[in-house]
């Protein structure tokens, strides 16, 4: 493994640590301060949750004096180094057209998103170089490889590629709910964005809102 590739993998682990810390700050207090959030909510209108995907998670958050909840359906993706970009490609396609891309098209779209994200890294070098570990140019070159794991810098750059927020969730210990660890790009690009699930072991999957009722 090259030194540049090792830095990419190390950064993915670093991003996991940042995400875990953010999750404790972002989601914990809202749920703890509103015990009634555990009640069954009324869901907004969404496509019905299908039984063919692996799992359905609920996200509960405090809104004013009450609670709001959304069900998210998991769309598994291959763990081939492209999982971040595959997840964003899958979630974007489902949100736009209600259907997932074919495997070959999804792979091509994931690679396209990867290269556009790296283009954004280079374009925004002055903004992001400080949190890229090691040599910036070597990092960008390594990140273009299909097997390189994407992490927090790439998620942020994908918000500029899509001109849309990307919200990252992690499963809660109860294995039935998820907690948001960050809505990247939400300040710059308001509105509903793309949701992805981070498992804490370097793997991402696509999430889409659905209706369990």
Regions found by a protein language model. Name each.
Residues 56-179:
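Papain-like cysteine protease catalytic cores
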Residues 2, 14, 146-150, 199:
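Short, well-structured alpha-helical patches and their helix-loop capping segments
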Residues 1-77, 93-98, 205-213:
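Non-catalytic, low-structured ubiquitin/UBL-interacting segments
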Residues 152-213:
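Alpha-helical coiled-coil scaffolding segments
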Residues 48, 90, 136, 141-144, ...:
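Short linear sequence elements within intrinsically disordered, low-complexity coil regions
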Residues 15, 26, 62, 79, ...:
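Intrinsically disordered, low-complexity segments enriched in small/polar residues
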């Amino acid at each position: 493994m090259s030194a540049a590739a090792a830095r990419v993998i190390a950064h993915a682990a670093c991003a996991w640590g940042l995400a875990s810390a953010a999750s404790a700050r972002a989601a914990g207090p809202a749920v703890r301060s509103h015990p009634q959030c555990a009640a069954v909510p009324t869901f907004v209108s969404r496509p019905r949750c299908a039984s063919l995907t692996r799992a359905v998670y609920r996200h509960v958050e405090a809104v004013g004096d009450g609670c709001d909840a959304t069900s998210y359906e998991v769309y598994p993706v291959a763990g081939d180094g492209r999982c971040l970009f595959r997840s964003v490609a899958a979630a974007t396609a489902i949100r736009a057209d209600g259907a997932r891309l074919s495997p070959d098209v999804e792979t091509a779209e994931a690679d396209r998103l990867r290269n556009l994200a790296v283009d954004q890294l280079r374009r925004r070098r002055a903004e992001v170089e400080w949190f890229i570990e090691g040599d910036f140019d070597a990092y960008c070159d390594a990140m273009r490889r299909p097997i390189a794991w994407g992490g927090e810098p790439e998620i942020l750059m994908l918000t500029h590629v899509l001109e849309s927020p990307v919200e990252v969730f992690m499963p809660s210990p109860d294995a039935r709910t998820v907690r948001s660890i960050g809505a990247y790009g939400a300040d710059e690009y308001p509105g509903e964005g793309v949701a992805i699930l981070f498992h804490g072991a370097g793997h991402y999957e696509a999430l889409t809102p659905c209706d369990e009722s």
